Amino acid sequence: STPLYSSAASDVYKRQVIDYKSGVKKFKLSDILDGLNLQMFVYLFALCDDKNAALNGVPAGVLYMHAARNILNFNSPIEAKNNLENKKESRFKMNGIVLSDNDNAIAKAMEHELEGKYIPVSASVKGVKGDLITLEQLGLLHKKINSLVKKMGNELQNGVIERAPIKNSTHLNTCDYCDYSDICANTKAIYNKIGANLKDEQVIESLHKEFENDAGMDNTTE
């Protein structure tokens, strides 16, 4: 967790969780609807919800960074000379979501010039764009993740552990990495094909509909 930023008018810190990955991680907000990629968000909301903890604060997003050392390939010495620095920098670009706030202060605290070199947010004459999320939208994610974790816990307690590996555009070979594949004896004909590959705005719209009658945002507002 990183204490990113504290406004002059408040002692409330904005908190992010950054996951350093040995492999390439492609984050999709729509995965949350299917109960995937919850881990870093669970950490984030747990930190921010604990009012007695030194690390509490307002959630400011989740980012994934490829931390492995890559070999840079070039077709010629001239190409290497012209593109070496850009390729070096591109290795450290993170993906995920960043909290959108007034004047984009949080994004600027991470990358001052907002060129989109290191975070999935960039600025131009037309404004700031990228993988941004509002505090209210993070509140909807909080509600959804709480609901999913509660459902998972109840199912485990009741012995519901079905053989239903997932399969979508980012999870093609789930069984290849499963420690229980030998005893499961799955023929790979049994797959829980999930994910409509929704755009971020469609995910938020879906969450609004799901929780439109709920009051409050699970303490994710300042």
Where in the sequence are the language-model features?
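Metal-dependent nuclease catalytic regions and adjoining charged, substrate-binding loops involved
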Residues: 48-180, 185-188, 192-194, 198-222
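Short amphipathic alpha-helical face segments that pack within enzyme cores
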Residues: 38-46
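Short helix/strand-bridging catalytic loops that position acidic/His residues to coordinate divalent metals
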Residues: 23-35
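Short, conserved glycine- and acidic-residue-centered signature motifs
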Residues: 5, 36-39
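Active-site ExK catalytic segment of metal-dependent nucleases
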Residues: 7, 15-24
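Cation-handling catalytic/transport regions enriched in His/Asp/Glu
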Residues: 22, 44, 54
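Single conserved hydrophobic/aromatic residue that forms the stacking wall/gate
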Residues: 1-9, 13
